[in-house]
A protein has these predicted regions:
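Low-complexity, Ser/Thr/Pro/Gly-enriched N-terminal "stalk/linker" regions
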Residues: 2-51, 320
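Well-ordered alpha-helical scaffold segments within catalytic/enzyme domains
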Residues: 2-6, 63-76, 117-135, 176-188, ...
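Solvent-exposed loop and edge beta-strand segments that line ligand/cofactor-binding
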Residues: 3-8, 44-60, 100-116, 160-173, ...
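Extended, well-ordered alpha-helical scaffold segments
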Residues: 7-18, 77-93, 132-157, 189-207, ...
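Mature extracytoplasmic or organellar-lumen-exposed domains after removal of signal/transit peptides
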Residues: 28-38, 49, 201, 205, ...
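Extended ligand-binding groove/face enriched in aromatic
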Residues: 60, 69-184
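Loop-centered beta-sheet repeat module
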Residues: 150-226
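Non-catalytic carbohydrate-binding regions of carbohydrate-active enzymes
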Residues: 209, 245-281, 287-327
Length: 341
């Protein structure tokens, strides 16, 4: 899809940044509800696996990135380091502590839904790699209790949730469901899959003329509208999606807003720098949607994919830590996510 690709040198640079991130303990943004003074502890005490990479969810998807790179390039020069790091991190005794944190009365909604979606995406990647890699099978087995817990929690939450969150930040409903759907398919989790499909249709199935002119918000790293479209593509067959898209797509003037990369004016600001993530996630969305779009729009989608990548791809490895602790994962989604996956 265009001239940009996840070439070997790019994969190596992503591997190096991810390896550095998952082992970097500080700075760390701890999202922690304390019930008493006894709950004060260093992040690693609560999160022995996901205590690096600035925050919990970024650590999770940096682990996913490493697994994905192993799947894409098993002979990568950094592969031995990746395997050693994952072997040290993804151990049953460590995952048991992570699971216990989610089972605390005050932590039941911790990282919902973004971190939940990424953890399920990580487990989906481990399960896929485990089909041909015995070492990955041990990592998948170690992570299974946490993934199973979050799958049940997410299905229960979806049964009770009435309204979606459409903002393009960590609380976005559609993005979490796209990530979780990968697990539901790979693990053949029919309960979760049905919950996702049912809620996606109820939340987004009747949307029309999406107001793309209202995007983006100043700290958004997701397009609420494009991400919603990726979700609906994942839960519909081709004909149904084509009919849905015809009603959903913004008018031509507004659609141009999604086709043009956003300008990032302050890359040292943790919130403003989210806009680099928006460029990369839009590229991912266009990659996933392009084959299912009407013929006149497909060349525009390919051009948008390329333009958005060129605008922000360098920040994944060359930017400040507020960017490099997370952007490479979205770069790989945009460059190498299986279409329809």
């Amino acid at each position: 899809m265009g001239r940009l690709a996840l070439d070997r040198e790019t994969a190596r640079s992503f591997a190096r940044v991810a390896l550095d991130n998952i082992l970097r303990r500080y700075p760390y943004k701890l999202d922690h509800m304390m019930a008493s003074a006894g709950d004060l502890a260093e992040p690693a005490a609560w999160h022995p696996v996901f205590c690096g990479s600035y925050d919990w969810h970024s650590s999770v998807h940096m682990h996913w990135l490493l697994v994905r790179l192993l799947a894409l390039s098993p002979d990568l020069e950094e592969a031995p380091r990746i395997r050693a790091a994952l072997d040290a991190q993804l151990r049953p005794e460590h995952i048991a502590v992570e699971l216990a944190y989610f089972q605390r009365p005050h932590s039941r909604t911790f990282e919902r839904p973004y971190g939940w979606g990424w953890m399920l995406k990580l487990q989906a990647e481990l399960l896929a790699l485990a089909r041909q890699d015995a070492q990955a099978a041990t990592w998948a087995e170690a992570c299974a209790p946490l993934a199973s817990h979050l799958s049940r929690q997410l299905a229960d939450f979806l049964d009770a949730a009435v309204f979606p969150v459409r903002t393009g930040t960590h609380y976005n409903s559609a993005f979490a469901l796209v990530m979780a759907m990968a697990y539901a398919r790979t693990h053949q989790d029919l309960t979760l899959r049905r919950a996702i499909v049912r809620r996606a249709h109820r939340w987004f199935g009747h949307d029309q003329k999406y107001p793309a002119r209202y995007e983006p918000g100043g700290d958004e790293f997701l397009s609420g509208g494009l991400t919603e479209a990726v979700l609906m593509h994942a839960v519909m067959d081709g004909c149904a999606f084509s009919e849905w898209w015809e009603l959903f797509v913004p008018g031509q003037a507004e659609l141009a807003n999604w086709l043009t990369p956003v300008e990032v004016t302050n890359r040292s600001d943790p919130k403003t720098s989210h806009l680099d993530g928006l460029n990369l996630s839009r590229a991912w969305c266009w990659r996933m949607l392009e084959p299912a779009l009407p013929d006149p729009l497909r060349p525009l989608a390919i051009r948008a994919w390329s333009d958005h990548l060129e605008a922000s791809l360098p920040q994944a490895v060359e930017g400040e830590y507020v960017s490099t602790h997370w952007l490479a994962s979205f770069a790989v989604l945009a460059l190498a996510e299986p279409i329809g996956g």
